[in-house]
């Protein structure tokens, strides 16, 4: 199969990369600003953002996973971060399928609790996105897992507590989180970092 052609069925091209049926080989994809690796490009396309995405840039200050903000054209003509794309560190999380099963289970449960409480679903619970093929995460050609969630506008992540009020608010939020999960079936959770 030559670059630039359409693959008719699942196959492995000479580079050793598995290609899904109907996907256009990588050389015909639109170049996305900020995307400098094949894995990141594959992930952007796997979640369905490739044709509309304005640009991608590193996001946050995490030390475990590799995180990117995905910017899309806004109605006002300005590019806006709408999604967070994250490569899960498999050196820490050996079973990404179990991590994602936990995340989808807990977030859906929390969203139902927030809905019942009349809360703001867009701000009070993470909203994860499945791949175009309906999977909870995408695995790139190197076996690296990627997940995606909606970006929460005007959210803040503190690396260090700067004032006592911040510590108080985080403790209050964590307590509320635990209360909401009080009846969650803990036996359905996987141990994602074994002892």
PLM-predicted stretches and their roles:
Residues 28-31, 35-40, 95, 163, ...:
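General structural signal for secondary-structure boundaries
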Residues 4-6, 24, 36, 50-52, ...:
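Compositionally biased, intrinsically disordered low-complexity regions
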Residues 32-57, 106, 110:
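Juxta-kinase regulatory segment immediately upstream of eukaryotic protein kinase catalytic domains
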Residues 55-195:
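Conserved ATP-binding subdomain of kinase catalytic cores across diverse folds
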Residues 1-35:
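Glycine-rich hexapeptide-repeat left-handed beta-helix
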